[in-house]
Amino acid sequence: MSPDPHEDLGDVLTEPTQKTERPRMFKVLLHNDDYTTMEFVVGVLQRVFNKSVPEATRIMLNVHNRGVGVAGVYTAEVAETKIETVHSMAQADGFPLKCSMEPE
């Protein structure tokens, strides 16, 4: 007699385990220019990057003094969306503020 396929043999079937890799992260950079106001940059950092006023001010001063500053670190898709949002806001207000991303 063949074994009943419905009989519980105590074996547990498991799915092969797959390691989930962390997504590659990217720094979103703000670039200094001679026209975009400091107040506008602080506002962008607050609205787009959810920074507090002190943190936004610190980042803005880095951008102003060093020419570039890190607004945040995100996955590629999130970074691209934030860059597009910054560029849209800057264009709407007549500022040439530039934003870019680079691998962390």
Swiss-Prot record:
Residues 1-20 are annotated as: Disordered. Transmembrane segments: none annotated. One of its GO terms (biological process) is proteolysis. It comes from the Bacteria. Involved in the modulation of the specificity of the ClpAP-mediated ATP-dependent protein degradation. Binds to the N-terminal domain of the chaperone ClpA. PANTHER family: ATP-DEPENDENT CLP PROTEASE ADAPTER PROTEIN CLPS (PTHR33473:SF19), ATP-DEPENDENT CLP PROTEASE ADAPTER PROTEIN CLPS1, CHLOROPLASTIC (PTHR33473). This is ATP-dependent Clp protease adapter protein ClpS.
